[in-house]
Amino acid sequence: LTRRYFDATVAGDLGEPRTIRNAVCMHEEDYGVLWKHSDMFAGSHETRRQRRLVISFFTTIGNYDYGFYWYLYLDGTIQLEAKATGITFTSAYAGDYATEVAPGLGAPYHQHLFSARLDMCVDGIRNAVDEVEARRLPVSAENPYGNVFRQSRVRLSTESGAARLADNGRARAWHIVNLESRNRFGHNVAYALYPEGQPVLLADESSSIHRRAAFATKHLWVTRYDPEQRYPAGDLVNQHPGGAGLPAWTAADRSIDGEDIVLWHTFGLTHFPRPEDWPVMPVDYAGFTLKPVGFFDRNPTLDVPPSASGHCHGGVDGPYEPPRVR
């Protein structure tokens, strides 16, 4: 296993550049089965192993430690996994709003909400976003047994109309399509954003956090690309009365149909702490996945070679050695 580490330069407490040695790690790892099929008639069996390139770093923010892991897969899938660990915030136990994690010690209910700024360029910069979901159909002459359902597709054409919530009950996803590039079936090439669909911000609309972190009230925002728009809550969150960032930017309601666009995806955890999270919390996970949809004409991993046949053996006395033939 080969690993590479990269330094990162960040802003220090006083705004000066500060270099963190070996801040980012990159390595490749096995990830189980890529694809497999056993043909009972021909007696053939084919299996290919999945590998992924991992780009990761950890950051400590107060009492919590967060790991951010980008996974790049052989089939074109891109995944982000956020890992939350560290020490939960505690106070005197309050039964209605916290979990007692030690005698008289409570860990309040809370959320970890992140915003991923996804500057998309799906086979070019002229992209658009379609909201795609399952649509149930009533029994009819076309659906006499009530078994079929359809795929609904709606173009999100303006910034204000693209502030959306996930809906796992409909398998809702967002397809980022290229309007100028088509696959062999004549369809626009695309990548799909698959959300986990966890709750967005639960704080009341009158709260200061709701005003300052309005980005966290939606799973999806889409804006025209602007290099000055980097932070979803604006530049000065703690000093702002609210409304900065995405709510202000999308108020212009610009067209995002066939433009250079940025997707902002809110994802995270709603954490009801457990006694097992104390005194240090085992990692909990959140994230999202981007998958090619018609971006390739077929499975792009058909040329992955089979693994060498072999078996792993081991024990307290060292590796297994087969008996010698005398």
Question: PLM features: what roles do these ranges have?
Answer:
Residues 1-77, 83, 90-96, 101-326:
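Extended effector regions of multi-domain proteins
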